[in-house]
Amino acid sequence: MKVLRKGDRGDEVCQLQTLLNLCGYDVGKPDGIFGNNTFNQVVKFQKDNCLDSDGIVGKNTWAELFSKYSPPIPYKTIPMPTANKSRAAATPVMNAVENATGVRSQLLLTFASIESAFDYEIKAKTSSATGWFQFLTGTWKTMIENYGMKYGVLTDPTGALRKDPRISALMGAELIKENMNILRPVLKREPTDTDLYLAHFFGPGAARRFLTTGQNELAATHFPKEAQANPSIFYNKDGSPKTIQEVYNLMDGKVAAHRK
């Protein structure tokens, strides 16, 4: 973990503040700013634990914080699937993840089926996408930074934990919740599984624009970058461009094929 000092800002400071709060040292709502209150609570924690009370969060302070931290929903309470590449074996995992996150297990099963056919060890040949939910390295790093401590995952510098189906499913659920929160106010309704898959596939920003563009507009005109990367989605076999509605119907059919 990074050495932190008063005046620092960023995700690591948020993690520090979260840990301090969980250990009983009240810094208020984590804001990512290492200010006076955070400094004072760090010093207090260090004094209480016989550490150098200089307010600098180095290796020893991080280690002591982590040793005292007990996550509310540790990922190890989620069962491992009894087999790989199996929807039936994945179902108890997703049911437990639903209980932990509030995201419907049916939705999680649909996405894992589309992305990896329930192969939690799979890695894409053309990108860094890995595991049940095919997380890219950068996205995974962000998810672990934002949600890892909630489930007892403190760090994963190599991204190896993407192949742990329990953690992949938990992070997949948290990403789905993020996308729900982005799409809901724009759509003024609950997003469907197809809406959410669009956000997963194209990114939430592009999905938001896609879902608010006229149905008869040519999709490639509005999304040239996505069309270039995914020509079979945006163009018919004869080369003619598809409309927004036609692309949506295609994606909806893909999602429907994995609903059970």
Swiss-Prot record:
GO terms for biological process: defense response to bacterium; viral release from host cell by cytolysis. The active site is at E115. GO terms for molecular function: peptidoglycan lytic transglycosylase activity. Optimum pH is 6.2. It catalyses: Exolytic cleavage of the (1->4)-beta-glycosidic linkage between N-acetylmuramic acid (MurNAc) and N-acetylglucosamine (GlcNAc) residues in peptidoglycan, from either the reducing or the non-reducing ends of the peptidoglycan chains, with concomitant formation of a 1,6-anhydrobond in the MurNAc residue. Keywords: Antimicrobial, Bacteriolytic enzyme, Cytolysis, Host cell lysis by virus, Lyase, Viral release from host cell. Belongs to the glycosyl hydrolase 23 family. This is Endolysin gp144. It comes from Pseudomonas phage phiKZ. The lineage of its organism: Viruses, Duplodnaviria, Heunggongvirae, Uroviricota, Caudoviricetes.
